[in-house]
Amino acid sequence: MIKINQIKLPVTHSDEALKKKIIKMLKLNAKTGFTYRILKKSLDARKKPELFYTYSVAVEIEDTKNSEEAIVKRAASSSVLIYKEKEYMIPACGHIPLDRRPVIAGAGPAGLFCAYTLAEAGFRPIVIERGSRVEKRTDDVQKFWESGILNPKSNVQFGEGGAGTFSDGKLNTSVKDPSGRNRLVLETFVRFGADPSILYDNKPHIGTDVLSEVIVNMREFLVDKGATFIFDTCVNNLDIVSQKLLSVYTDSDNNSQIKTDVCVLALGHSARDTFDMLYNKGFDMECKSFAVGFRVEHPQRMIDESQYGIQKKIILPPSPYKVTSNFPNGRGVYSFCMCPGGYVVNSSSTENHTVVNGMSYHDRNSKNANSAIIVSVSPKDFGADDALAGVRYQEKLETENYKRGNGLIPQQLFGDFCDDRLTTAYGDFGSCTKGNTVFAKLNGLMNADMEQSFKLGMEHFGHLIHGFDRKDAILSGMETRTSSPLRIKRDESFESNISGVYPCGEGAGYAGGITSAAIDGIKVAEAIIKKYRPDFK
């Protein structure tokens, strides 16, 4: 195949215009037959309000008289080159017989893709998820948003699909993976029901509503491949002798002990009771830096006009944004989990704690844009340096946040936040939320240095996106679960200091988001496959 980069066309272009551009760049005869596939599509707004789509495409020539090499040479362009697609290959099995099925604790993206890879290699994993299957979980979450009644086991954080199920389903990642794992993740999502556009969109997203359906299809496939799913069940203990795993224990009344030589800890970033258990069991762990802040809402129309340079009269998706700033005090302030056309959601998972997140459906059709504007925190902010210090810091913020809103999402306009004043009414636009809200002061939740950094960050972002620091921008408190506050150490073989236990994904400190967690799950599965061969009785 031939790859063409940097095909630039107006956003209103037709399919025929793209074909003509391919013919022109390859200097083909108009009668030459060819097929093409989009590899990458991104919006170029650098000359706004003139907007363009930029494409990379793979072209297959049907005319065998002209070799691809000859066509590339004739094109005489650095944007035209020979293309060979990287196909992901599961590694060959190792030599050590594994006669007890591997256990995966957690059915988020890391756990699911670890299970998917293991199942494809014949390992028939047992997946144990503390939360409910996604069908029941969706009902539990909706009930919580409507009534405030929290199910500590089945909520926005816990349950099949992981915390990312109730976000935007964003799939972009900064992970560079030449082995084809990133492509495998996207193709697998499409295989189980996601829109094929995620394969080439520069900012791919599935949407909460579609992602739930994809997860069900993926689970059913894995069951057909020999995997077992155990829901509403938490791994609460490990049997370890001489630094070697012998079995896992769960809080189930039936068959609470599962003998195994391999356990993948695909924990979410909110599995605090499991972190405690692992710490007390002697796992090598360390606290790490993360970030906290507030979910900030603006009118989506304002963001579109700023990013696109026009009032959105032509068909364009709701615009995302990404903003970042660093200050002399060493703090970074940046946007996180930006949700175009989204909702602020109550994503609490513990009684008497309040935490928020952002969410979008596939069509991203709410009137507001939101993102977390967060401030970096490091172990020095925790006042301690043990592995669980960051967890305790999160809990402190979340319990105080709960008190501010009396269990509801506390909100304050940015202007009132700057003036340390209670908000009494929204400004020119209202909030789009899932979960009940109340006006409350958010001042003092972060320390003075962090709060000042947040204000300066908002002001700086106002120079980048007109209106970002408007006084009626809506702040919702607090966003504390941006990433895991700790890391469970592992060696080059992906094992912890306990033989047979493999820390994996976001909760273990090795990923940040759906795609990177899924890739890490695949990597851990590969390590297991390379070491063992299935030999189940």
Residue ranges and their predicted role:
Residues 3-53, 58-166, 170-537:
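Residues forming the flavin
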